[in-house]
Amino acid sequence: MRIKRKFLKEAVAKCAAGVEAGTGLAQAGKVIFVPGYIMGIGTSINVRVPCADVDCSFMVDKAALDKALSKSSDDIDIIRDENRIIFKYGRSRLALPFADIPPTLALFPEEWGQAPADFIRKIRSVAFPNKTGYAGVAWDSDAYAGLVSTDSVRIVVAGCADLPGGAWLPDTAVAALIKAGSECTGIVNDMPYIHVRYADGTVCSVLYRSVSDFPVGPLCQYIDAFDGGSIVTEGELGEEALDAIKGAEGFTDVFDAQVPVHISFAPGSLNVRAENAGGEFYGEAEWPGEYTGHFTVDARPFNAMKASAKAILKMVDGNIALEIRDGDVRVLLSPDP
């Protein structure tokens, strides 16, 4: 079989990047070829890149393959004989011993479920990759939630009825799903794995756990509690808050940064203070509500406000709940002392 060198190099790198986002390689430093795919395998994450030219199954050392790929600009012919794999490029040849892949890796879903079109976007919207204590993402039939082990659920985003209920993905699995691609086209629940297929044909398989294993308990309790909370005030917070943050002199890229945003409410106005490596920056805006108080939140909910200016503050078991109704983001916060 003949494979384009550039494609093979990119495919191997993509597999490695996805797997390295996980908990380490189960088959350390190996690249696996199975019919139709090039694959990297980790202890809880598998990444497969489609390659129609692969017509047999074998496993080779990644470092040796990388060396071959770095020495040639030619397409690579791959020949398998009884006990070795021969990579032929130009006038050079590289013969590598190979191992048969574990039989379980040959299994692959034949039927794909209909995936929510915005699955990766919603997973990303509740992930806190740089947040201390970030544990991962959970979902049930009603919602996704970002989980922080030190203070339970931080952000909840509604809607994921097509996924297996009560699943929890550790932070490493979430990172792998996000790295693998952005547009999801199919999902298979293959307990204990979820296989996610992307628009370019890449497949990322991640090991999930039951949400009951996480100390926050059933996710639905948080959804129900939020829906039953009492409204403190309601107003057009979104655009004003955005203007307050963006208008602070010297503050840039707040929406892409993992920074805390401090919000102080007073009748008729709100004050926003944000921090990054360059210092502290301030902004003010009008607020039509009567709520008085202060809390801290990551910048991500304000990013969601780009799609909606409606915001509602609720009291849920002594916590402040900020809901961006049309933007589909819910945040459970504890008021700052």
PLM feature segments, named:
Residues M1-P337:
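Structural preference for solvent-exposed beta-strand-turn elements
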